[in-house]
């Protein structure tokens, strides 16, 4: 799940880095990612040790916070703390966002702010109505290489897919079904309210 979060956020964050490098076609995406809340619907295939795992879900993110729902889990992060909810087993895990190099794994939204310092982004290659970006890491972040495809067929550029080679040898391919923007949500949206869970739930707090 962390690999899916990391790669999906890198996919979104590329618009910020590319626009900063002077890519005018992504300026509108950059502005939206910087000033609004982004809602993303995705499907993905994770290949690890020859085994393929299919998944799909939704991601809502702004600043250093996110909520991700998919593959039977709900994950909330307000930039400081992390709540992982497994509804089927009625378990909740609470932890602090890590510091240092591990911070990118416990709160991948940090990749958005540090994208230019973490990745080298090659010049985009345009094929038909699509633009492909290649990236390679400058430091450890869980990804060894990746590509992102953006469609410019319509009036506004949109993300369509991403393919990422993970540091542990896994391969993650993501298809973006939709990506929309809205006004920023209150920070409480990214915090799990524990008052709604009764004694039948197992809550583990590692903070």
Predicted regions and their residues:
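Short, exposed beta-strand/loop patches in secreted or surface proteins that constitute
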Residues: 31, 56-61, 74-75, 120-126
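N-terminal leader/targeting segments and the immediate start of mature chains
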Residues: 5, 16-52, 64-65, 196-207
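Short beta-strand segments that buttress and anchor functional surface loops
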Residues: 42-46, 67-71, 132-140, 161-165
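Bacterial N-terminal signal peptides that target proteins for export
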Residues: 1-8
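Short, surface-exposed coil-to-beta transition loops
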Residues: 52-56, 70-71, 78-79, 143-148, ...
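Non-transmembrane domains of secretory- and envelope-associated proteins
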Residues: 127-131, 139-145, 154-207
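An acidic-aromatic
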Residues: 58-105, 169-172
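Flexible, surface-exposed loop/linker segments and immediately adjacent secondary-structure boundaries
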Residues: 97-130
